Amino acid sequence: MESNSFFFDPSASHGNSMFFLGNLNPVVQGGGARSMMNMEETSKRRPFFSSPEDLYDDDFYDDQLPEKKRRLTTEQVHLLEKSFETENKLEPERKTQLAKKLGLQPRQVAVWFQNRRARWKTKQLERDYDLLKSTYDQLLSNYDSIVMDNDKLRSEVTSLTEKLQGKQETANEPPGQVPEPNQLDPVYINAAAIKTEDRLSSGSVGSAVLDDDAPQLLDSCDSYFPSIVPIQDNSNASDHDNDRSCFADVFVPTTSPSHDHHGESLAFWGWP
Protein backbone atom coordinates (compact mmCIF):
# COMPACT_ATOMS: atom_id res chain seq x y z
CA MET A 1 0.00 0.00 0.00
CA GLU A 2 1.31 3.42 -0.85
CA SER A 3 2.44 5.64 1.94
CA ASN A 4 0.24 8.53 0.89
CA SER A 5 -3.01 6.56 0.57
CA PHE A 6 -6.09 7.44 2.65
CA PHE A 7 -8.52 4.75 3.78
CA PHE A 8 -11.05 3.92 6.50
CA ASP A 9 -10.91 0.67 8.49
CA PRO A 10 -14.46 -0.73 8.79
CA SER A 11 -13.30 -3.70 10.81
CA ALA A 12 -12.69 -1.57 13.83
CA SER A 13 -15.35 -1.26 16.47
CA HIS A 14 -17.86 1.56 16.35
CA GLY A 15 -16.22 3.48 19.14
CA ASN A 16 -12.65 2.98 17.89
CA SER A 17 -12.85 3.61 14.14
CA MET A 18 -9.64 5.08 12.77
CA PHE A 19 -8.50 7.03 9.72
CA PHE A 20 -5.07 6.32 8.26
CA LEU A 21 -3.01 8.53 5.99
CA GLY A 22 0.19 7.44 4.31
CA ASN A 23 2.22 5.19 6.57
CA LEU A 24 -0.75 4.35 8.79
CA ASN A 25 -0.24 7.19 11.30
CA PRO A 26 -3.52 7.87 13.11
CA VAL A 27 -5.02 11.26 12.38
CA VAL A 28 -8.25 11.21 14.30
CA GLN A 29 -9.19 8.47 16.70
CA GLY A 30 -12.10 7.48 18.89
CA GLY A 31 -14.40 10.14 20.27
CA GLY A 32 -12.61 12.93 18.36
CA ALA A 33 -14.29 11.92 15.12
CA ARG A 34 -17.65 11.78 16.81
CA SER A 35 -17.13 15.30 18.25
CA MET A 36 -16.37 16.67 14.81
CA MET A 37 -19.50 15.07 13.37
CA ASN A 38 -21.60 16.50 16.20
CA MET A 39 -20.25 19.99 15.48
CA GLU A 40 -21.14 19.63 11.80
CA GLU A 41 -24.66 18.55 12.63
CA THR A 42 -25.07 21.43 15.05
CA SER A 43 -23.91 23.94 12.44
CA LYS A 44 -26.28 22.51 9.89
CA ARG A 45 -29.14 22.54 12.35
CA ARG A 46 -28.69 26.19 13.44
CA PRO A 47 -26.82 28.72 11.24
CA PHE A 48 -24.81 31.49 12.84
CA PHE A 49 -26.84 34.30 11.21
CA SER A 50 -30.61 33.86 11.47
CA SER A 51 -33.14 35.70 9.33
CA PRO A 52 -36.18 37.45 10.91
CA GLU A 53 -38.38 34.64 9.60
CA ASP A 54 -36.24 32.08 11.40
CA LEU A 55 -36.45 34.11 14.58
CA TYR A 56 -40.19 34.39 14.11
CA ASP A 57 -40.62 30.63 13.79
CA ASP A 58 -37.89 29.56 16.20
CA ASP A 59 -38.93 28.30 19.60
CA PHE A 60 -36.06 29.58 21.75
CA TYR A 61 -32.27 30.09 21.75
CA ASP A 62 -31.22 27.21 23.97
CA ASP A 63 -28.68 25.17 22.01
CA GLN A 64 -28.64 22.41 24.57
CA LEU A 65 -32.09 21.15 23.55
CA PRO A 66 -31.76 18.31 21.04
CA GLU A 67 -35.19 18.67 19.37
CA LYS A 68 -35.49 20.26 15.98
CA LYS A 69 -36.88 23.70 15.25
CA ARG A 70 -40.65 23.78 15.56
CA ARG A 71 -42.91 26.11 13.63
CA LEU A 72 -46.03 27.67 15.10
CA THR A 73 -49.40 26.82 13.66
CA THR A 74 -51.74 29.39 12.18
CA GLU A 75 -54.08 29.20 15.18
CA GLN A 76 -51.22 29.77 17.60
CA VAL A 77 -49.98 32.78 15.62
CA HIS A 78 -53.51 34.22 15.52
CA LEU A 79 -53.94 33.90 19.30
CA LEU A 80 -50.52 35.44 19.90
CA GLU A 81 -51.38 38.37 17.62
CA LYS A 82 -54.60 39.04 19.53
CA SER A 83 -52.71 38.92 22.80
CA PHE A 84 -50.06 41.28 21.44
CA GLU A 85 -52.70 43.79 20.31
CA THR A 86 -54.13 43.73 23.82
CA GLU A 87 -50.77 44.25 25.51
CA ASN A 88 -47.39 44.20 23.78
CA LYS A 89 -45.48 43.75 27.02
CA LEU A 90 -45.33 40.24 28.37
CA GLU A 91 -45.39 39.67 32.11
CA PRO A 92 -44.16 36.38 33.61
CA GLU A 93 -47.63 35.28 34.75
CA ARG A 94 -49.17 36.12 31.42
CA LYS A 95 -46.35 34.34 29.60
CA THR A 96 -47.03 31.18 31.59
CA GLN A 97 -50.78 31.35 30.91
CA LEU A 98 -50.27 31.81 27.15
CA ALA A 99 -47.79 28.95 27.04
CA LYS A 100 -50.26 26.59 28.73
CA LYS A 101 -53.13 27.80 26.56
CA LEU A 102 -51.23 27.39 23.28
CA GLY A 103 -49.37 24.25 24.23
CA LEU A 104 -45.99 25.97 23.96
CA GLN A 105 -43.12 26.52 26.26
CA PRO A 106 -42.84 29.90 28.05
CA ARG A 107 -39.55 30.55 26.25
CA GLN A 108 -41.27 30.22 22.87
CA VAL A 109 -43.91 32.76 23.83
CA ALA A 110 -41.26 35.21 25.10
CA VAL A 111 -39.21 34.94 21.90
CA TRP A 112 -42.29 35.46 19.73
CA PHE A 113 -43.28 38.59 21.66
CA GLN A 114 -39.73 39.92 21.43
CA ASN A 115 -39.62 39.52 17.65
CA ARG A 116 -43.12 40.91 17.27
CA ARG A 117 -42.23 44.04 19.21
CA ALA A 118 -39.17 44.58 17.00
CA ARG A 119 -41.28 44.39 13.85
CA TRP A 120 -43.93 46.63 15.41
CA LYS A 121 -41.32 49.30 16.22
CA THR A 122 -39.99 49.08 12.68
CA LYS A 123 -43.48 49.57 11.24
CA GLN A 124 -44.08 52.45 13.62
CA LEU A 125 -40.86 54.13 12.50
CA GLU A 126 -41.86 53.67 8.87
CA ARG A 127 -45.27 55.26 9.51
CA ASP A 128 -43.68 58.14 11.38
CA TYR A 129 -41.21 58.65 8.57
CA ASP A 130 -43.97 58.70 5.96
CA LEU A 131 -45.94 61.20 8.02
CA LEU A 132 -42.94 63.44 8.53
CA LYS A 133 -42.04 63.18 4.85
CA SER A 134 -45.52 64.25 3.75
CA THR A 135 -45.47 67.10 6.28
CA TYR A 136 -42.06 68.20 5.04
CA ASP A 137 -43.21 68.17 1.42
CA GLN A 138 -46.25 70.25 2.32
CA LEU A 139 -44.16 72.74 4.28
CA LEU A 140 -41.68 72.97 1.42
CA SER A 141 -44.48 73.72 -1.03
CA ASN A 142 -45.88 76.37 1.31
CA TYR A 143 -42.41 77.87 1.70
CA ASP A 144 -41.97 78.14 -2.07
CA SER A 145 -45.34 79.87 -2.44
CA ILE A 146 -44.51 82.25 0.42
CA VAL A 147 -41.16 83.09 -1.18
CA MET A 148 -42.91 83.90 -4.47
CA ASP A 149 -45.45 86.11 -2.68
CA ASN A 150 -42.64 87.83 -0.79
CA ASP A 151 -40.76 88.60 -4.01
CA LYS A 152 -43.94 89.99 -5.57
CA LEU A 153 -44.64 92.21 -2.57
CA ARG A 154 -41.02 93.39 -2.50
CA SER A 155 -41.22 94.44 -6.16
CA GLU A 156 -44.47 96.33 -5.46
CA VAL A 157 -42.88 98.10 -2.50
CA THR A 158 -39.90 99.10 -4.64
CA SER A 159 -42.17 100.50 -7.36
CA LEU A 160 -44.25 102.48 -4.86
CA THR A 161 -41.11 103.82 -3.20
CA GLU A 162 -39.76 105.09 -6.52
CA LYS A 163 -43.07 106.81 -7.28
CA LEU A 164 -43.14 108.44 -3.85
CA GLN A 165 -39.57 109.69 -4.22
CA GLY A 166 -40.46 111.21 -7.60
CA LYS A 167 -43.39 113.07 -6.07
CA GLN A 168 -41.24 114.35 -3.21
CA GLU A 169 -38.57 115.62 -5.60
CA THR A 170 -41.25 117.44 -7.61
CA ALA A 171 -42.67 119.01 -4.45
CA ASN A 172 -39.21 120.12 -3.24
CA GLU A 173 -38.40 122.02 -6.46
CA PRO A 174 -38.28 125.87 -5.86
CA PRO A 175 -41.30 127.71 -7.34
CA GLY A 176 -40.98 130.52 -9.93
CA GLN A 177 -39.49 133.73 -8.48
CA VAL A 178 -42.10 136.47 -7.97
CA PRO A 179 -40.69 140.07 -7.95
CA GLU A 180 -41.05 141.86 -4.65
CA PRO A 181 -43.09 145.10 -4.55
CA ASN A 182 -40.02 147.18 -3.66
CA GLN A 183 -38.02 145.78 -6.55
CA LEU A 184 -39.41 147.79 -9.48
CA ASP A 185 -38.23 147.48 -13.02
CA PRO A 186 -35.64 150.14 -13.98
CA VAL A 187 -37.42 150.58 -17.29
CA TYR A 188 -40.62 151.39 -15.43
CA ILE A 189 -38.76 153.96 -13.27
CA ASN A 190 -37.24 155.67 -16.34
CA ALA A 191 -40.61 155.78 -18.05
CA ALA A 192 -42.15 157.43 -14.97
CA ALA A 193 -39.38 160.07 -14.86
CA ILE A 194 -39.81 160.88 -18.58
CA LYS A 195 -43.56 161.19 -18.12
CA THR A 196 -43.06 163.64 -15.26
CA GLU A 197 -40.66 165.79 -17.32
CA ASP A 198 -43.16 165.90 -20.19
CA ARG A 199 -45.85 167.18 -17.87
CA LEU A 200 -43.59 169.90 -16.52
CA SER A 201 -42.36 170.99 -19.96
CA SER A 202 -45.87 171.35 -21.40
CA GLY A 203 -46.33 174.75 -19.70
CA SER A 204 -49.49 173.77 -17.83
CA VAL A 205 -50.23 175.36 -14.54
CA GLY A 206 -50.42 172.02 -12.76
CA SER A 207 -48.30 171.53 -9.71
CA ALA A 208 -45.55 168.95 -9.47
CA VAL A 209 -44.56 167.03 -6.38
CA LEU A 210 -40.91 167.67 -5.71
CA ASP A 211 -38.80 165.86 -3.21
CA ASP A 212 -35.19 165.43 -2.31
CA ASP A 213 -34.75 162.82 -5.05
CA ALA A 214 -35.29 165.42 -7.84
CA PRO A 215 -33.10 168.48 -7.02
CA GLN A 216 -32.84 169.46 -10.67
CA LEU A 217 -36.49 170.49 -10.70
CA LEU A 218 -35.98 172.80 -7.72
CA ASP A 219 -33.04 174.54 -9.34
CA SER A 220 -34.86 175.23 -12.60
CA CYS A 221 -38.02 176.73 -11.20
CA ASP A 222 -37.29 180.11 -12.86
CA SER A 223 -37.21 178.54 -16.28
CA TYR A 224 -40.84 177.52 -16.01
CA PHE A 225 -42.03 181.05 -15.11
CA PRO A 226 -39.87 183.47 -17.16
CA SER A 227 -42.42 186.34 -17.27
CA ILE A 228 -42.59 186.79 -13.52
CA VAL A 229 -40.35 189.56 -12.21
CA PRO A 230 -38.96 188.88 -8.78
CA ILE A 231 -40.10 191.31 -6.11
CA GLN A 232 -37.53 192.72 -3.77
CA ASP A 233 -38.32 192.56 -0.09
CA ASN A 234 -36.55 193.68 3.04
CA SER A 235 -35.76 190.22 4.32
CA ASN A 236 -32.27 189.12 4.94
CA ALA A 237 -30.28 187.33 2.34
CA SER A 238 -29.90 184.28 4.49
CA ASP A 239 -33.63 184.11 5.09
CA HIS A 240 -34.23 184.64 1.40
CA ASP A 241 -32.01 181.73 0.54
CA ASN A 242 -33.55 179.45 3.12
CA ASP A 243 -37.16 180.26 2.37
CA ARG A 244 -36.88 180.37 -1.38
CA SER A 245 -39.28 178.22 -3.33
CA CYS A 246 -40.69 178.04 -6.78
CA PHE A 247 -43.71 180.15 -5.84
CA ALA A 248 -42.05 182.60 -3.45
CA ASP A 249 -42.21 185.58 -5.91
CA VAL A 250 -45.49 184.77 -7.50
CA PHE A 251 -47.86 185.90 -4.77
CA VAL A 252 -47.42 189.64 -3.87
CA PRO A 253 -49.26 191.03 -0.87
CA THR A 254 -51.48 194.07 -1.58
CA THR A 255 -52.90 196.49 0.91
CA SER A 256 -56.62 197.00 0.80
CA PRO A 257 -58.30 199.98 2.38
CA SER A 258 -61.01 197.77 3.75
CA HIS A 259 -60.87 196.90 7.43
CA ASP A 260 -62.75 194.42 9.45
CA HIS A 261 -64.95 195.38 12.34
CA HIS A 262 -62.01 195.13 14.70
CA GLY A 263 -60.06 197.69 12.74
CA GLU A 264 -57.46 195.29 11.59
CA SER A 265 -56.41 195.40 7.97
CA LEU A 266 -56.64 192.24 5.89
CA ALA A 267 -53.91 191.35 3.47
CA PHE A 268 -54.86 190.12 0.01
CA TRP A 269 -52.64 188.31 -2.35
CA GLY A 270 -52.93 189.27 -5.95
CA TRP A 271 -52.17 187.12 -8.95
CA PRO A 272 -50.13 189.15 -11.53
Swiss-Prot record:
It is found in: Nucleus. GO terms for biological process: leaf morphogenesis; negative regulation of translation; positive regulation of DNA-templated transcription; response to blue light; response to salt stress. InterPro entries: HD, HDZip_class_I_plant, Homeobox_CS, Homeodomain-like_sf, HTH_motif, Leu_zip_homeo. SMART domains: HOX (SM00389). Residues 125-160 are annotated as: Leucine-zipper. The keyword Repressor does not apply. Transmembrane segments: none annotated. It holds the Pfam family HALZ. Residues 158-183 are annotated as: Disordered. GO terms for molecular function: DNA-binding transcription factor activity; DNA-binding transcription factor activity, RNA polymerase II-specific; protein homodimerization activity; sequence-specific DNA binding. Residues 65-124 bind DNA. Widely expressed. One of its GO terms (cellular component) is nucleus. The keyword Chaperone does not apply. Keywords: Activator, Developmental protein, DNA-binding, Homeobox, Nucleus, Transcription, Transcription regulation. Residues 158-171 have a biased composition (Polar residues). It comes from the Eukaryota. Interacts with DNA as homodimer. Interacts with TBP2. Belongs to the HD-ZIP homeobox family. Class I subfamily. This is Homeobox-leucine zipper protein HAT5. It comes from Arabidopsis thaliana. The gene is HAT5.
